[in-house]
């Protein structure tokens, strides 16, 4: 049985991915790293909180970014690479955790303790969830889903070889509306525990 477990979880906006991730992390008794906790750690390294929030899983401004070898003058790229280094360090420390987004499935693709998940959903189910959670009209919710997913996709595809949401990049992809939030979390927990027990 593996003594360390690292779960990377990508998600479509409105799929309930964060809610499901929280249930999984609490059941397994491991740390959840999401936008807020990652921002907090990077801010402690000297980056401004406003800058981090502005660049959170946003696409790179190609006109403002120039790369020289492994180095870049782009703040977006530097913040992203700092995030990836932090993720690798946590994995190398032996810590078990669940990471939401941040190209986790690619950053840790060679780690034998990593299991990668992607949560999507039926468009109507996602629309209803965003409308209810945010108090938006259908038109506003459609635009929010389109914008957020476009930003996540552009961010991910800039840094990763495999495309965002491509099932081949993940160990398991699911639609949360098929079993519901709790049912999806329970199924994924069983999958993760089976992965842990596998030599």
Regions found by a protein language model. Give the residues of each.
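Small-molecule kinase domains that catalyze NTP-dependent phosphoryl transfer to phosphate-bearing small molecules
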Residues: 60-66, 77, 138-182
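Pre-Walker A (Motif I) flank of P-loop NTPase domains
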Residues: 2-11, 95
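Short beta-strand-centered segment that lines the nucleotide-binding/catalytic pocket of NTP-utilizing
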Residues: 31-43
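ATP-dependent small-molecule kinase phosphotransfer cores
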Residues: 42-96
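Short, amphipathic alpha-helical "lid/cap" segments that border enzyme active or binding sites
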Residues: 84, 181-189
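Conserved phosphate-donor/acceptor-positioning beta-strand/loop module used by diverse small-molecule
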Residues: 110-133, 138-146
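Glycine-rich phosphate-binding P-loop
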Residues: 8-22
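Short, polar loop motifs at secondary-structure junctions
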Residues: 101-105
